[in-house]
Amino acid sequence: MQNYKFLKDINFPSDLRKLSENDLQEVSNEVRKEMIDAVSETGGHLGAGLGVVELTVALHYVFDTPNDRLIWDVGHQTYPHKILTGRKSKIKTLRQGNGLSGFTKRSESEYDPFGAAHSSTSISSALGMAEANKLSNKLNNIIAVIGDGAISAGMAYEAMNNAGASKTKMIVILNDNDMSIAKPVGAMRTYLAKLLTGKIYFSLRETFKLIVSAFSKRFSVKAGKAEDFLRSAVTGGTLFNSLGFYYVGPIDGHDLSTLIPILKNARDSKHQGPIMIHIKTQKGKGYSYAEKASDHYHGVSKFNVVTGEQVKSGTNLPAYTKVFANTLVKHAERDSKVVGVTAAMPGGTGMDIFAKDFPKRMFDVGIAEQHAVTFAAGLATEGYKPYVAIYSTFLQRAYDQVVHDVAIQSLPVRFIIDRAGLVGADGSTHAGSFDITYLSTLPNFIVMAPSDEAELVKMTNTSMTINNKPCAIRYPRGNGIGVELPSIDENIEIGKGRVIQEGKQVCILSIGTRLEECKIAAAELKNKGIESTIVDARFAKPLDQELILKCAREHEAMITVEEGSIGGFGSHVENLLSEKGIFDKGLKFRTMILPDIFIEQDSPKKMYDVAGLNASQISKKILDILFTKESIKVVKN
């Protein structure tokens, strides 16, 4: 840590509160420097945290955290919060194995009263805490901080609707930086822009600051006529007022001389109901490279602080995301019915590539996964070919729509599921562990998992031909293995796997990108005199029953390997073998799946070590099946 004037002596917010208000801007500057220094070494979310440094300092200065509950939506903006709440010495372990989480986490600190990583949960959880306090006759404050992107999601509207009718005091800080990950979209964004650019805001901005300063003592003591005047003068009627919120703003979120008295006023207010404080901030504030390109500095790899240059991956292998996007563009050039849908993640899913060539056929619906799925279903009813590109972890948020609006109606929506399996530094909140399970259980679904980038191209090609039911293609974060890519005319037969190599004793059924580990495991077994058949199953649904049953009858043992949880591919294979009476004939069988735990952040390789799904663990499992007395074996009568 640098030799800071103030930060060196701040370990907890109680230390911060000992300082004069006049010192807080320098504290903010030091926190900002420390954050930039840390993220330059660890990588992580940079821009969002830089934009809320002053807000973070002000909140911990004004409120009695952790007794007062401070809830951050999403949590990727909480690095300054972590620096000020007892985690300063560990800040350079962010997103590392056994290090600090990149998000808020209840088990990490009492200053994190609610864990986060997915968006739009803060107002709901804050309202729950506020109602609990009312029932318990507690007087502590509950504060939720939510961004302009996250507040556009349906869950946030549901929470505001409930909060406005509750007459329960809570404080919501709307952090408006005009940039969630990609630029926010939709009517809410337009509405907030009008609030920020209207004549009232600009003409009264300085006047507002002066009045707050003049009445600062009165503001800190009680709400009065000055507060009522400011509220009516600055806001007039707003959507938030209509929802039952006492709305103040918009105000400059980097101006501590304005923030602190307004937060004190909200803290001390006797208003019975929710209070909304709308602040305007700049994502990437204080670091010129992040200010100029805030979308590219949302999440960063390690970087040079002086030049802003990020460390490149050092590989020329194509990313799965880009392989899919480029393949879809080629199909869209041929077929005008191809359309893209994403939920506020065009860059992460590769749909920004599609949008450059087909802007009118690309729909970014914002942080609205439920809407995205049903919107795509509507497109499908009119003969279009919607591709919903979404992270596995975020598709979970729209499961009812997948079932009710897509699967039951057998609509040909194509789900392109990125970040399947274990994802590394973002940890358990972003892992794609469950999609094979929750999609393969649905009637009318086709579920595919490519073993490499060439297979991804073939599956994307094949999805173009599926016009009577939904399908899904799931693939991991990261790069392929360097195989040659096929043309867009090369399809695969639905429900048919492929044999990679043939042996006599054991059959390894792999689905997805664990195939390379299975090959290494088979080589290890060969050195021990054990011959293995390897099958790339390709499809979790429908299963290649003919191939699976043939392999089961011709081998002493069979093992399935997948990057998914219980109830997925292996469970469906086991059910097939049971129904066909294969176990009655003595087959030794095991499934290798993700364990029944949430695996914490680390490198993907280390996470798969924890999961028991790397090559040496696969070969050991097979040896156990073949040679231990405890192996599962159903003997003939």
From Swiss-Prot:
Catalytic activity of the protein: D-glyceraldehyde 3-phosphate + pyruvate + H(+) = 1-deoxy-D-xylulose 5-phosphate + CO2
InterPro entries tied to this protein: Dxylulose-5-P_synthase, THDP-binding, Transketo_C/PFOR_II, Transketolase-like_Pyr-bd, Transketolase_C, Transketolase_CS
Presence of keyword Metal-binding: yes
Signal among keywords: no
Residues holding Mg(2+): 148, 177
Needed co-factor(s): Mg(2+); thiamine diphosphate
Binding site for thiamine diphosphate: 76, 117-119, 149-150, 177, 287, 369
Keywords: Isoprene biosynthesis, Magnesium, Metal-binding, Thiamine biosynthesis, Thiamine pyrophosphate, Transferase
PROSITE patterns (alphabetical): TRANSKETOLASE_1
Record note on cofactor: Binds 1 Mg(2+) ion per subunit.
One annotated GO molecular function: magnesium ion binding
Membrane-spanning residues: none
Enzyme class, first EC level, given as a word: transferase
EC number: 2.2.1.7
Subunit structure: Homodimer.
Stated role: Catalyzes the acyloin condensation reaction between C atoms 2 and 3 of pyruvate and glyceraldehyde 3-phosphate to yield 1-deoxy-D-xylulose-5-phosphate (DXP).
Family according to the record: Belongs to the transketolase family. DXPS subfamily.
Protein name: 1-deoxy-D-xylulose-5-phosphate synthase
Species of provenance: Pelagibacter ubique (strain HTCC1062)
Source organism phylogeny: Bacteria, Pseudomonadati, Pseudomonadota, Alphaproteobacteria, Candidatus Pelagibacterales
